[in-house]
């Protein structure tokens, strides 16, 4: 089962080259509480229970996949963790620009680099545009891979 968030925060089920609006299945989610539970995105947490409702809601002709705007795949991540130089080419690039990088000595060792937190609102979907708030400042592009730690994943 391939699910997605698309257009105006609609939950979709992708089948072949079409996306089916299965947002009705979200009605089965438990009501939010305060303080909010800290166990992650409610859809992901309750996915096993919602799966039959998601599959049953995939009716009609769907929307061609090319006509939807995909949003971030996780609507409510609990946290996003990063590391400054996370692959060999970036470490080599940083080593050539020591005046720019605060450590002055890029290292492949994670203990030297440390980790940092990003806002959980920093995620975007495929094809979405990153808006630079201060375009006159130096901005380094980053391409990231998200990993869910803690549960076996399926596609």
Which sequence ranges carry the predicted segments?
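Metabolite-binding pocket within alpha/beta catalytic cores that recognizes anionic/polar moieties
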Residues: 116
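Non-heme Fe(II) oxygenase catalytic core, chiefly the N-lobe of the double-stranded beta-helix
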Residues: 119-155
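N-terminal non-catalytic cap/leader segment that marks the start of a structured domain
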Residues: 1-113, 136
